[in-house]
Amino acid sequence: MLNKTLQSHSLTFAKKSIYLRSVVFAPVHVSVLHLVIAEFKYSLGKVERGYNNRTLHIDLSNMRITSKPVKEMMKDKFIGGRGFDLWLLWNSLPKDRIAKWNDPENEVCIACGPLGGTPVYPGSGKSIAVSISPLTAAVVDSNVGGYFGAYLKFAGWDALEVQGNAKKEVVIFIDGDQGNVQVEEAFQLPSETHLIVDILAKKYGEDNPQSISVVSSGPGAEHTFFGCLNFSWYDMGRKAHRYKQAGRGGIGTVLRDKKVKAIVVKYSGKITVETNGPADVETLKQVGSTYNLEIRKLDPKQNEMSVVGTTHLVTIMNEFDLLPVDNFRFGSNKEAQSLGREVYRKKFDKGFDGCWVGCSLACAHGVRDFELKTGPYKGQKVFVNGPEYETIAGVGSNCGIFDADYVIEMNYYCDVYGLDTISVGTATAFAMECYELGLIDKKSTAGLDLRFGNKEAALEIVHQMGRGEGFGPVVGQGIRRMKKIFEEKYGAEPRIMQDIGMEAKGLEFSEYVTKESLAQQGGYGLALKGPQHDEAWLIFLDMVHNLMPTFEQKAENLHWFPMFRTWFGLNGLCKLPWNDVVPEDNKETKEPAKVFAHIERYAKYFYAVTGKKVTVDDIILMSERVYNFQRIFNLRMGFGTREHDAIPYRAVGPVTKEEYESRVDRYDKQLKEKFGYDTANKSTEEKMTALRKFREMEYEKLKDAVYERRGWNANGVPTLEKVKKLDIDFPDVVELLKKHG
């Protein structure tokens, strides 16, 4: 599927559009979708205690559809959601070689989790997608809102595996009303999310669009390595299809490489407190009601998530010098208020806006009747889903652009083209800095003046990704490949690109400046899939509140928080209700950052659905099993050791003289008081060299402390003792660890 520009890693630009399709502007009649290639009928059954006890496997190469049983071992050790996905993928890949992302054996796995699909508990509508990433060549997971995972479960399946490569473009339809799975030829269906979802909802949903949820990507995923998955749901209040994204790691690129235009699930049944088959309905009602009342009372006083969503973070990050500006060179800018909560308070459509039924946090948000200024839909008024903080910071401030309408337009086209806004923003910012440093020029960029702040050029990059032409697909290869291309084609200095290229493990950084937080450097660098904040977000605890001054305290938090956050992905939950709204007396508790009152509530929630009583320690243990298994999975893929936990120096300290001097008082003070270095009569360059030495040494010490706390050896590999303790010492796991012992 990917064009030859990407396959060869060449900079040869296509002369014309690769994906030119008249159907972008002309409607496709739904009757063209009816040639069934494969079909599988099944009995519907009933969800019991959060499970169907079976998963669905679709082999596109052989057009074979099968059902697999879920055994008790799988539930006990992998719980559901991300855990199920990882276990299924682990067993699908060849044992005699390392599979690549575009090998037919690779899968796109999607699961919900036992708690997912509960309407009375906030944040219970998440799906988790897992695959081998085109960016990292290792396993990647992505947590996403919407109705798909819940509908998949209510249609009879705890997880979905899509394996193999179809010979022609296809649509997968899972009919949870009739108990039927079909693979159909896609014919002339467009790739663009907003077009294909509308067509498929009309075909399969008929007069009930709310019964349909669609997973799709877009043409940008066909021409880049960071294609996202769009998960749709129907907004009854606005009478429109809405979207959330499984953005990180390029799973959308994998889906399009398999020639899958869309996966559709249908469920027309009523969603009630009993639909998920809970073990204790009354406890579930009680714990859900308590949480919802707390959110309705306290959210207006705290972050106003139900009004401004995550946009409130822009002002906070800017205030604490944590907002990425100009490729993470700086942490604040006087123009940041033009991207902040008060701007989006006015722009967001009013009224309840949640991505799951019954979620009182309701933080989805979108912009109604936004008139597009560029691209194939110029002049059209559209509904834009978002933007959220990561998009605002990524395609906005990090590219030196402080224009809210521009960010909204970028958000829209990234969704339509199926592109991860975080990777788009961070990769574009890297290309901009390379351009300003003279490492590449206009000839390299096919005529684009790629300066920071040039919003027209940034938008054109995205349109080129959608069309598969120009410099856009080069940026779409991601920072790691761009560094290689710029060095080989243009003689760019590799050392400076290594320092300023904000990627680790091949994945672009999400949007927080980490220079002054050693713990967050570890949160990014030690994250399993690469530098994504959903695993460990410790900046405030470390930098602002100074609650972990020692390496041991940092290591403890870099153990506990990733473990607890992992638990959300095992169960089909959103993390935001846990700590974006907190009890009124939370500050008086022993460890307020952990919000133990809410964790105890999650334990009750787990019991109410599954019937299994658990403690906080049990929750951490559940996550530890899956977390360590994923680390070992990376080892199987040829990664997962100490060297792969490296991060670029800009994540650690100032790369340029300009960066140092923007915080000169802070850095001079640290050199003198923390490291005992005499700054008198020293040049900026000398001080930068000294600071780098000290900070890089600290990061290595942090690795040692975290590895020890997690039960890993000095090379970052889980020990045999650790996996035996976690009861994941499967024969192939033990054999793999012995090779790296």
Whereabouts are the PLM-identified features?
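Protein-protein interaction/assembly regions in multi-subunit complexes
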Residues: 32-252, 257-272, 278-300, 314-324, ...
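Intrinsically disordered, low-complexity proline-rich regions
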Residues: 20-21, 26
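Extended C-terminal regions of large enzymes
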Residues: 103, 124-126, 201-204, 208-214, ...
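Polybasic, lysine-rich low-complexity intrinsically disordered segments
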Residues: 5, 15-17
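Autoprocessing domains of the Hint superfamily
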Residues: 25, 33-34, 359
